[in-house]
Amino acid sequence: MMTKVLGMAPVLGPRPPQEQVGPLMVKVEEKEEKGKYLPSLEMFRQRFRQFGYHDTPGPREALSQLRVLCCEWLRPEIHTKEQILELLVLEQFLTILPQELQAWVQEHCPESAEEAVTLLEDLERELDEPGHQVSTPPNEQKPVWEKISSSGTAKESPSSMQPQPLETSHNYESWGPLYIQESGEEQEFAQDPRKVRDCRLSTQHEESADEQKGSEAEGLKEDIISVIIANKPEASLERQCVNLENEKGTKPPLQEAGSKKGRESVPTKPTPGERRYICAECGKAFSNSSNLTKHRRTHTGEKPYVCTKCGKAFSHSSNLTLHYRTHLVDRPYDCKCGKAFGQSSDLLKHQRMHTEEAPYQCKDCGKAFSGKGSLIRHYRIHTGEKPYQCNECGKSFSQHAGLSSHQRLHTGEKPYKCKECGKAFNHSSNFNKHHRIHTGEKPYWCHHCGKTFCSKSNLSKHQRVHTGEGEAP
């Protein structure tokens, strides 16, 4: 189980004595304070994982409550199976990481296991480079080892888990660019010399405690780097130590908070949506490193996702998921439209498309529709009305979508591009058919012989063998 909450709550100071009216009031305030900053998804996950049998009167109630908590966390009504699987894999992946890396990755709030892996790979590359510096999330520019030290180990007492005010320590000066991003309050101190003087006076009584924290932070820094090096057999431990020594000797110390030069050395906080990661091949920019890593595969041709059944490789995990369905041959639940499913629940969900209430009925053929607009568009088939005309060649269409698709023949526009091979298409249906070549997906299933097809037209041709209308292709 993950020992930390994804994301960091804002740093809070100690409560004034006058707020602590009574034990009950203190308890309520702490609950509200925690609930305010916990991400909802992580809060539901913790409720599910920390639920105890003693909280319910009996086994049936316990099972029922667990189901409710699980649904609140995984949200099956809005998440797909792949998204739910990714949440579970991400949780387990963070659990098996070494403690030092686990805390660091959680601070970056990865949304998927793939993004967590990309963060670790980026960290390895940064540690391999001379004069490296560990990147931190935009909202909290704090040293990695300082974060781990402040956010705690598994055996901390409850009192130590309370948020503490940020302390300025001279121990961070020796780390060069790995410094703390100034918050709004600290920037006010930097602009007002009187506040800087008051701040220094208030921290002089805690110098011994700061020195102890600094030594602990140094030890944790060495721990997280040693974990990375230990998992890289090609890296030399001696070479890494030399790099660390050179770094300590050459990096300029952090200037005082009150000096103008010190304020200029602090990196500016990235603006939301800023695209700082640029592809060296084509110049395309991305807002995070994981998207850049995925994009690079279009240039390198790398396909890290391999099917364990047939060995076929893919550049994206989503394509592997689609392909893997082709090996799940057992699809006993089929629909009249030709699609087949491995579970009856999936078939029922699909059949709702056919059994939806359709109050608008065509007088000519009896076909029903759920919306009036759909009936009007359908009725043009019988009347032959084609109100949408192409200005280039004069060809007319019964639907606006047909005109838009046709006009791309004149403009040459092909907005639907395949990520695997780069081929582009002017219509989404053509793109979907082409994409099945890469994934191997064959969703159309013959209920007579079990043969599968990638398109409905191929299934219709094949079924003529069983009906006696013609030969199979």
Curated annotation (Swiss-Prot):
Residues 258-272 have a biased composition (Basic and acidic residues). Its main location: nucleus. Disulfide bonds: none annotated. A zinc finger (C2H2-type) spans 277-299, 305-327, 333-354, 360-382, 388-410, 416-438, 444-466. The keyword Cell division does not apply. Signal peptide: none annotated. One of its GO terms (biological process) is regulation of transcription by RNA polymerase II. InterPro entries: SCAN_dom, SCAN_sf, Znf_C2H2_sf, Znf_C2H2_type. Residues 45-127 form the SCAN box domain. It is found in: Nucleus. GO terms for molecular function: DNA-binding transcription factor activity, RNA polymerase II-specific; RNA polymerase II cis-regulatory region sequence-specific DNA binding; zinc ion binding. Residues 148-171 have a biased composition (Polar residues). It comes from the Eukaryota. It holds the Pfam family zf-H2C2_2. There is a cross-link at K27, K221, K232, K349 (Glycyl lysine isopeptide (Lys-Gly) (interchain with G-Cter in SUMO2)). Keywords: Activator, Differentiation, DNA-binding, Isopeptide bond, Meiosis, Metal-binding, Nucleus, Repeat, Spermatogenesis, Transcription, Transcription regulation, Ubl conjugation, Zinc, Zinc-finger. Residues 127-171, 244-272 are annotated as: Disordered. Belongs to the krueppel C2H2-type zinc-finger protein family. Strong transcriptional activator. Plays an important role in spermatogenesis; essential for the progression of meiotic prophase I in spermatocytes. This is Zinc finger and SCAN domain-containing protein 21. It comes from Gorilla gorilla gorilla (Western lowland gorilla).
